[in-house]
């Protein structure tokens, strides 16, 4: 990259890349439109069905925004696995039916026992190797694993045979291409919850 990105103090771009925001949108909500656009694109790529239980792994901005979007779109069962008690409480406030602290739940079999079932769809939004391992262990056979966490230097011990033998569909979603208009519209609708 040769120029500062969108999170720089100042940057130069062409007007066609800008999206007008309503004057009534608070700056703290506007700052979340980019991660919201990531969520919008991920939802499109994953072909999510509101009747199917979804588990979100990761209680950062993208995991919490995914929780909010799915809950407001009428998903009946949205659960979240995270590690920060105040964010787990926020996830419930945003619409998660169940939350679990992975520091208390353990891993692998203990995690499956704690949730009492595998999930048809698991969204990995933590960006951590441990989160990826937990996500994979909680996907039901023939289920889908949507990966939107960015791993940087973190490494997951990915179990390819588990994916193969359980016929798990892997879906990666990166960035927010072509999701900005919907994200701006959604931010207007969800701004009270996004400001929490």
Feature map (PLM): residue ranges:
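Short glycine-centered segments of the SAM/dcSAM-binding site in methyltransferase folds
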Residues: 53, 143-145, 169
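N-terminal Rossmann-fold NAD(P) dinucleotide-binding loop
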Residues: 63-64
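Helix-to-beta-strand junctions that scaffold the AdoMet/dcAdoMet cofactor pocket
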Residues: 139-141
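NAD(P)H dinucleotide-binding glycine-rich loop of Rossmann-like/cofactor-binding domains
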Residues: 1-57
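Adenosine-nucleotide cofactor-binding segment
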Residues: 56-59, 71-134
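Acidic carboxylate diad motif detector
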Residues: 148-149
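C-terminal substrate-binding/catalytic core of Rossmann-like NAD(P)-dependent dehydrogenases/reductases
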Residues: 109-112, 116, 152-196
């Amino acid at each position: 990259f040769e120029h500062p990105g969108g999170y720089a103090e100042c940057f130069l771009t062409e007007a066609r890349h800008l999206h007008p925001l309503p004057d009534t949108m608070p700056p703290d909500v506007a700052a979340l439109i980019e991660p919201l656009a990531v969520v919008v694109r991920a939802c499109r790529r994953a072909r999510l069905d509101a009747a199917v239980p979804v588990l979100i792994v990761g209680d950062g901005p993208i995991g919490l925004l995914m929780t909010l979007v799915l809950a407001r779109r009428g998903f009946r069962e949205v659960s979240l696995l995270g590690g920060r008690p105040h964010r787990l409480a926020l996830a419930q406030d945003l619409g998660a039916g169940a939350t679990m602290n992975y520091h208390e739940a353990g891993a692998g079999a203990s995690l499956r026992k704690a949730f009492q079932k595998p999930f048809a769809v698991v969204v990995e939004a933590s960006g951590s190797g441990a989160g990826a391992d937990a996500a994979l262990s909680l996907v039901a056979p023939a289920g889908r694993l949507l990966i939107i966490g960015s791993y940087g230097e973190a490494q997951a011990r990915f179990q390819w045979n588990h994916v193969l033998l359980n016929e798990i569909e892997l879906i990666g979603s990166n960035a927010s291409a072509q999701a900005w208009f919907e994200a701006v519209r959604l931010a207007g609708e969800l701004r009270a919850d996004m400001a929490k």
